[in-house]
């Protein structure tokens, strides 16, 4: 079930290079906000980029930042410092709202 309101379907889809996750993108010259939803269990491989802040809306997120793993549940927030290597595991049905420092982190489909 999608936790976001139906009007969010009008927000552009984000082009994500990972199978099993979809998202909606709101972008500005100063950063991006992406509303992610894991359709199935998803493993995000290690990577790095500009700063990121997020909140778990539904489900569970296991986030590993600089080798330290932490599990987040609905209502909990997380922050990834700029340049920090990180990876993630999202359970099926997990929804996140992520704010990215980089204004060009993702592109719309």
Regions found by a protein language model. Give the residues of each.
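Glycine- and acidic-residue-biased ligand/ion/polar-headgroup-sensing regions
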Residues: 49-62, 66
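A cytosolic small-molecule/anion-sensing beta-strand core signal
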Residues: 57-58, 73-74, 92
């Amino acid at each position: 079930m999608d936790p976001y309101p139906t009007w969010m379907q009008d927000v552009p889809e984000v082009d994500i290079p990972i199978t099993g996750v979809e998202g909606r993108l709101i972008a500005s010259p100063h950063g991006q906000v992406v509303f992610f939803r894991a359709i199935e269990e998803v493993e995000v491989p290690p990577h790095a980029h500009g700063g990121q802040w997020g909140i778990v809306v539904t489900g569970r997120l296991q986030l590993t930042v600089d080798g330290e793993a932490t599990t987040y549940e609905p209502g909990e927030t997380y922050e990834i410092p700029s340049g920090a290597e990180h990876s993630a595991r999202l359970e099926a049905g997990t929804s996140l709202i992520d704010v990215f420092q980089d204004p060009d982190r993702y592109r719309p489909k």
